[in-house]
């Protein structure tokens, strides 16, 4: 796959003339600090915090993209903007050429904290999403979709269980099924495996790889894990530290699919990619720590 980079834009592409599915244009996000009553009396203005700045990115259809960077660099802020859950201070995003500024069924979101309705069963959590997006759909068709995605994520037999009866891995599988059941154009995943133990995390990574092979949705994954990004991604977006975090570099991951984690380090270029990511994260993290010491 080709990687085109210039000052204005970073384009992830295998064919340069193919239209991007997701486009981010000059995205910045500024948060206003709180102003105390004393500051108001003294007529002090609140301080601004620039979380991300000057983000330009285009992603082609059916592409798995991971975003990685030091803690606090605005990865989740960027994902929330793509999801329509937060508005950029400058710039805009578009999907298939249409500017979007709110959540929509074209983007399914999987959260780290699961975000399941505790009073609903597994099937009801998924069905609620389908009913919300497709209110006029026949009941039988809704139920068929729910069962299809329960099967896809390997939860047959758990349809009537409530979230408190599920392990963390099972809850996350419900979240993935719920996001996919509305048939989005892309899946947005905010550190979905961060709270899981190593064995469960590895199992779900393999499940996501399998599901991606079957569904071929575009995926944007936020992660702290170099190995996870290399296992799952077609491209890896590396961000600088905040404030005013930017895209530092985009790495193309040329490994064949389907991938086997036990063979990952044998792929040509694996060690070079891993070393580049380790060097970037080490440099950015060290700079963050040094800036904290100086304060």
Residue ranges and their predicted role:
Residues 91-103:
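Conserved ABC transporter NBD signature motif
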Residues 120-129:
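Short coil-to-helix segment of the ABC ATPase nucleotide-binding domain corresponding to the Q-loop/switch region
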Residues 162-166, 170:
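Conserved ABC ATPase signature
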Residues 181-185:
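A short, proline-enriched helix->beta-strand linker immediately N-terminal to the Walker B motif
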């Amino acid at each position: 796959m080709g990687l085109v980079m210039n000052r204005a834009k970073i384009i992830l592409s295998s064919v340069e003339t193919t239209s991007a599915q997701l486009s981010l244009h000059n995205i910045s996000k500024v948060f206003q600090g709180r102003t105390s009553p004393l500051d108001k009396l003294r007529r002090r203005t609140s301080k601004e915090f620039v979380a991300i700045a000057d983000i330009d990115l285009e992603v082609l259809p059916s592409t798995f993209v991971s975003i990685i960077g030091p803690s606090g660099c605005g990865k989740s802020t960027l994902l929330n903007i793509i999801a329509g859950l937060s508005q950029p201070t400058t710039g805009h995003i578009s999907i298939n050429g249409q500017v979007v500024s709110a959540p929509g069924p074209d983007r399914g979101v999987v959260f780290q904290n699961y975000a399941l309705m505790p009073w609903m069963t597994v099937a009801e959590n998924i069905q609620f999403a389908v009913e919300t997006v497709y209110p006029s759909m026949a009941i039988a068709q809704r139920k068929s979709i729910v069962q299809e995605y329960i099967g896809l994520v390997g939860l047959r037999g758990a349809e009537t269980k409530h979230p408190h009866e599920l392990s963390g891995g099972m809850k996350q599988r419900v979240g993935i099924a719920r996001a996919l059941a509305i048939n989005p154009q892309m899946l947005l995943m905010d550190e979905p495996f961060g709270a899981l133990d190593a064995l469960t995390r590895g199992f779900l990574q393999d499940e996501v790889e399998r599901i991606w092979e079957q569904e071929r949705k575009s995926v944007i994954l936020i992660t702290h894990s170099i190995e996870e990004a290399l296992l799952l991604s077609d491209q890896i977006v590396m961000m600088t530290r905040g404030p005013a975090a930017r895209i530092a570099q985009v790495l193309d991951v040329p490994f064949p699919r389907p991938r086997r984690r036990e063979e990952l380090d044998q792929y040509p270029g694996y060690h070079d990619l891993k070393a580049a990511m380790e060097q970037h994260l080490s440099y950015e993290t060290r700079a963050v720590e040094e800036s904290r010491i100086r304060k």
